[in-house]
């Protein structure tokens, strides 16, 4: 092994068009600019089929991105798995689906999840397929608890999806049936917290969906239009709402009902799953709750058994980079703040909690701020940098990885000035890590998991608007080594080529199932 290796993941930093909406270029980033001008580098595909998603129209995300980075292979991912299991009928043949349908006799079936076709956390087509199948199998009452997106899709597109869903529900309202939207709210306000950053969001979702508490409206459309006029918020930030008839909620989630969480992505599905699933749940009070028949679209964490019941078998990712390095006795260090800590650990390790080898691995989490990221766009970049430099100086580890979340988390706010500042903070971190690499003798690899900050605007039909979703742009892969001029082979590469490159640099043998090394 020539040198220990540091991998820096600049979350949400792709190669944009260099225009006024490209915060990566607009920002003053002298370190990144210098690295791109002087170091071996290429650009990696970070979306679509390169990361296991159904088509190249599908934007990448941090989950599938870190899976690919950490396992050196392209696996069929959530959206693709679910789509296949719906098409071939295996979902409806599962014991879990059969139990949910049987249980709904004389009761209600509830569908909860993100309402869009963003294909990052969910897809409305999956919800519609499940609703139609439930109706075909005799379920009389089905209610939707919808979380509004505006993050993986255009910022104010919620009404398009609501209208699409309402059309289907009206078709399913045949004699004796009641199919309706019961509650909802913006995904960054209710239900979809992750990494235990803000349990208050989940509690708000519980009060809204389960207890039917909250401001009432005659329809989801009325709620969205009213809140937009009152608050000026984009979809992801709209407050919670309850749909009512004659002053009463259309549907609460009652004890004994069937409940399906139709999101396929794990990070923002785990907390609400725990609230439904666990008898010993203690994050907030659940007055009168004795339990429902609950299932997730996938199992979101196999090691922690979240949830206990699920409709589609998740990808079992074997032969990860961590497994290869542990087998070789390599000491590893993984670091980020709360918002991306799970990405450099759980997702990196193939959707598994815990460590492969306690003796060889150290994971460190810096708690994230619980304030809007546009108000503090530096996030914890300084603290991440300090910890990385400290651990490089210790020389305890041969492979260190960190994630700077700024480009993605601030990118999602759509506030250009904040994103530009966020990028400058990441560049400051890079500078210190490069200096430490020179001082202590490391090779540094710099990449990203997907784009976001590189495309902050989009133009449709001649109209330019703020973009808050990930981009389809490739991401940089840079090799910095002051003592060795590495040569990147010609070719077309994706995120899954990073792990093989790390192993090659270390002089180790990659598993046969892996993609090729870039060097």
Model-identified regions with their sequence ranges:
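Feature captures the catalytic ectodomains and active-site-proximal regions of enzymes
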Residues: 1-519
